[in-house]
Structure formats: structure tokens, C-alpha cells
């Protein structure tokens, strides 16, 4: 039974089993290609990316330039954009493995029941939370954040997740 729980994304800790929901860490507040740096451990091209406009303020190198011009990107388009330098004020972006109906996901429960595989939330210019349905993807993001020297790296679990809404503002 333990093995099947682990395969479903469970982490054994003493007598309690915690589900790893994602990772959290702090990024530097500077103009850089931070989204690319975080996501390069993932096959970005295999996802469809949906930016939630009302929850996103990201600037390109020209201050008056909105970094993301569209709400929806195929993986190859998305990776070409995120390679450019940008400054994140706040961001909510959702990743899907297949093209489907896209909608703004408001709660963790909606995320679990949706076709969305990853939600990236950045707020206050430096705090990042990435939710993933796949534990191994969360581990990749955690290792990547540590390798980049990002601060306050940790896993988001059922036990420590205080977020009630998937929102950054």
C-alpha cells in the first residue's frame, strides 16, 4: 500500500503521509530571464501556456512594454519569449499538456479537478509558488531553485499550504 501511495504523490514522514503539492522559493528582484531559468528543467515546448491577464504584470526591458502580449502560447512560442529579460511584479500562469478549454483556476481543489498540470504564482516581485500534479516535476523545480541559489526553498504540502486561492493579487 505504501508504494502505491508514493506513486500517487505522497511523502512518508513518520506516521503521517503528506502530499507534495508543489514548491516555494524567493527569486531576486532584478531584470533577468527568470521564468526561463526556473522552467528550463522542464520540457517547456510540450505544454500549452495560459497567462491570466488580471493576475499578471511582467515588464520587458523597455519599461512601457508588456512582456506577454497574448494570453495563450504554444510551448515553442512561450520558450522564445521567456528567454528574453524581464522583471516580474506579479504573475499567474497555467500550463496544460494538451490543448483544451482554458479557464482561470481559483482554488487548489479546482486545480486538482482540472486539465491544468502546473500553476506558477509570483507575487511581491520575489515570492514564487509552483503547484504541480506530478511530484517528480515538483522535485525538479525544487532542485532547480536550489541550483540557482534561490532563497527559502521548500515543498508545499497538504500540511503546510495556507493558500486558500490561486491568486497573486
Residue ranges and their predicted role:
Residues 13-15, 41-47, 146-155:
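Structural alpha-beta junctions
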Residues 19-76:
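N-terminal interaction modules that seed assembly of large macromolecular complexes
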Residues 32-35, 57-60, 102, 129, ...:
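Short, surface-exposed beta-strand/loop "edge" segments at domain boundaries and coil↔beta transitions
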Residues 45-47, 115-118, 125-128:
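Short, surface-exposed beta-edge/turn micro-motifs
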Residues 53-120:
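Surface-exposed, low-hydrophobicity interaction/linker segments
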Residues 122-169:
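Acidic, proline/glycine-rich low-complexity IDRs
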Amino acid at each position: 500500500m505504501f508504494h502505491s501511495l508514493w506513486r500517487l504523490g505522497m511523502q512518508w514522514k513518520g506516521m503521517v503521509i503528506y502530499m507534495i503539492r508543489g514548491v516555494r522559493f524567493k527569486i531576486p528582484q532584478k531584470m533577468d530571464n527568470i521564468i526561463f531559468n526556473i522552467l528550463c528543467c522542464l520540457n517547456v515546448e510540450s505544454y500549452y501556456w495560459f497567462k491570466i491577464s488580471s493576475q499578471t504584470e511582467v515588464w520587458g526591458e523597455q519599461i512601457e512594454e508588456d512582456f506577454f502580449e497574448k494570453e495563450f502560447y504554444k510551448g515553442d512560442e512561450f520558450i522564445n519569449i521567456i528567454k528574453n529579460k524581464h522583471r516580474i511584479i506579479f504573475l499567474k500562469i497555467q500550463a496544460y499538456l494538451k490543448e483544451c478549454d482554458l479557464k482561470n483556476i481559483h482554488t487548489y481543489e479546482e486545480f486538482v479537478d482540472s486539465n491544468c498540470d502546473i500553476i506558477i504564482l509570483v507575487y511581491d516581485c520575489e515570492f514564487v509558488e509552483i503547484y504541480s500534479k506530478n511530484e517528480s516535476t515538483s522535485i525538479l523545480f525544487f532542485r532547480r531553485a536550489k541550483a540557482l541559489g534561490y532563497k527559502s526553498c521548500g515543498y508545499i504540502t497538504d500540511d503546510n499550504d495556507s493558500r486558500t486561492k490561486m491568486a497573486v493579487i
